[in-house]
């Protein structure tokens, strides 16, 4: 009898929760229509996996890619609409948030074709891989529009949990397991630090959780210059620094990059940076508006450390993925310049533009690494020697992406850095910009060192991996080459037409 009553209560509670969720989706679903498309794609993937055999694998890729493209289309159709707040103030929709969501969707759309051949060759579970990628994308999109502390915590955890699972996807690989453990432990610690900072912010504002209400609460309680806010700022900066791989919270990055499957590294290297940058711009600009001098100083120190350590340590690396890990630490230091400049002097516009170029440069480089790794089984930089003699297309593609990452003209990376540094210079960040310029020169050195190896023709320097290299057919349907071509074009041509891109980015400001 007691069990029967408990069962009825459980059914009633479940029904109430379902009806409340249905009510929210019915009246607020239009605000998260791009996210709803991804959720529908996730459900379709699960249904197909449960009801079909291995012959329907192409459908899984098609559904994943289509749901991402449709989400991008939904975002573009909603462009220039008035800012809206939904879900009782938990979610905000505006152009600024939507362009970060667009960048995350773009990353995922390019990463799926980049992963197809790798998954087939390594015999990884396909459905779970795609589910984790789409769920992480969904978490990143919700993070971009998060308007309260609870959503800001839950959304990145959704992204992070999928990232942990993806990094350890090759379970038989000891390095992958090690990378997952380090990522999980350090990620959990950083989340705890972030939440501790949120608790100080919550208490100081008089119990508010919405970002704008926190700022108003700090004025009402006159706590905006209190020691509690300084403590909150330090803890939140450390937590966000981990998500961005800012020094000194960068220790996890090289190990995770080296141990994780290469397509996973490509995905994490860009999506995590975009999502965390969206979080940083909103949380520093709104609740910490009255502490702008303090967080500017904190971010300047972290950016300088990241640019110097990232680029100097990258010189000594022998693994291509570890080199790109340290390179990404330096690259995010450049992005921080745009966050510090902010609305004034087009800081956010230059940051968004550079992140768009960084996505194409980084994913193009990883596409080349995936292609080379599948044919040779190595990740050592020395083993790339003489690649041009065997596969000129792959060698030239990798060279162009690396040169663009280094910021050599007339490639997109040069114009992106130029505009970013110019905005920083106009804002008076002379020392920070000078460090950025010097470390960019350092980065060009180790990129050119790799390009020199690629183009060498001396037999004594060519390794057995390149001698036995199997080049794919010219008319191949290789999906990696599709991603590679798109990224290489995006890393070279857009730099020439910077003005329209900057103009679009300027329209995304608050």
From Swiss-Prot:
Its EC number is 7.1.1.-. This is NAD(P)H-quinone oxidoreductase subunit 2 A, chloroplastic. NDH shuttles electrons from NAD(P)H:plastoquinone, via FMN and iron-sulfur (Fe-S) centers, to quinones in the photosynthetic chain and possibly in a chloroplast respiratory chain. The immediate electron acceptor for the enzyme in this species is believed to be plastoquinone. Couples the redox reaction to proton translocation, and thus conserves the redox energy in a proton gradient. It is found in: Plastid, Chloroplast thylakoid membrane. GO terms for molecular function: NADH dehydrogenase (ubiquinone) activity; quinone binding. The lineage of its organism: Eukaryota, Viridiplantae, Streptophyta, Embryophyta, Tracheophyta. Keywords: Chloroplast, Membrane, NAD, NADP, Plastid, Plastoquinone, Quinone, Thylakoid, Translocase, Transmembrane, Transmembrane helix, Transport. InterPro entries: NADH-Q_OxRdtase_suN/2, ND/Mrp_TM, Ndh2_N.
């Amino acid at each position: 009898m007691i069990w029967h009553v408990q069962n009825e209560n459980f059914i009633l509670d479940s029904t109430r929760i379902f009806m409340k969720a249905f009510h929210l989706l019915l009246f607020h679903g239009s605000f998260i229509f791009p996210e709803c498309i991804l959720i529908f794609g996730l459900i379709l993937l699960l249904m197909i996996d449960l009801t079909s055999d291995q012959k329907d694998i192409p459908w899984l890729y098609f559904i994943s890619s289509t749901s991402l493209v449709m989400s991008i289309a939904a975002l573009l159709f909603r462009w220039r609409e008035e800012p809206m707040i939904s879900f009782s103030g938990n979610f905000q929709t505006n152009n600024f948030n939507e362009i970060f969501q667009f960048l995350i969707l773009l990353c995922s759309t390019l990463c799926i074709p980049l992963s197809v051949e790798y998954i087939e060759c390594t015999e990884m579970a396909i459905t779970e891989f795609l589910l984790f990628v789409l769920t992480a994308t969904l978490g990143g999109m919700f993070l971009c529009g998060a308007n309260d502390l609870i959503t800001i915590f839950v959304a990145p955890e959704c992204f992070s949990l999928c990232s942990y699972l993806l990094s350890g996807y090759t379970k038989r690989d000891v390095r992958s397991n090690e990378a997952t453990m380090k990522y999980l432990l350090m990620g959990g610690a950083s989340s705890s630090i972030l939440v501790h900072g949120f608790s100080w912010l919550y208490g100081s504002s008089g119990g508010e959780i919405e970002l704008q209400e926190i700022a108003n609460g700090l004025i009402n309680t006159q706590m905006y210059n209190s020691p509690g806010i300084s403590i909150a700022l330090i803890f939140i900066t450390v937590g966000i620094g981990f998500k961005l791989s800012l020094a000194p919270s960068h220790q996890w990055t090289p190990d995770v990059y080296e141990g994780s499957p290469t397509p996973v590294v490509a995905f994490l290297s860009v999506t995590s940076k975009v999502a965390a940058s969206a979080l940083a711009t909103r949380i520093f600009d709104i609740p910490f508006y009255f502490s702008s001098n303090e967080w500017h100083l904190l971010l300047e120190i972290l950016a300088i450390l990241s640019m110097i350590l990232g680029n100097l340590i990258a010189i000594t690396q022998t693994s291509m993925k570890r080199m790109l890990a340290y390179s990404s630490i330096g690259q995010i230091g450049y992005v921080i310049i745009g966050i510090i400049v902010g609305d004034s002097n087009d800081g956010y516009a230059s940051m968004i533009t550079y992140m768009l170029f960084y996505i194409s440069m980084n994913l193009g480089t990883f596409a080349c690494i995936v292609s080379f790794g599948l044919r040779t089984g190595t990740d050592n930089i020395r083993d790339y020697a003489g690649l041009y003699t065997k596969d000129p297309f792959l060698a030239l593609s990798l060279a162009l992406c690396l040169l663009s990452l280094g910021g050599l003209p007339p490639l997109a990376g040069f114009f992106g850095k130029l505009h970013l540094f110019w905005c920083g210079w106009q804002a008076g960040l002379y020392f920070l910009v000078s460090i950025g310029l010097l470390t960019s020169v350092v980065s060009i050195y180790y990129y050119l060192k790799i390009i020199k190896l690629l183009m060498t023709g001396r037999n004594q320097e060519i390794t057995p991996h390149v001698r036995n290299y199997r080049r794919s057919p010219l008319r191949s349907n290789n999906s990696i080459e599709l991603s590679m071509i798109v990224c290489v074009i995006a890393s070279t041509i857009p730099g020439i037409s910077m003005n329209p891109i900057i103009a679009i980015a300027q329209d995304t400001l608050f």
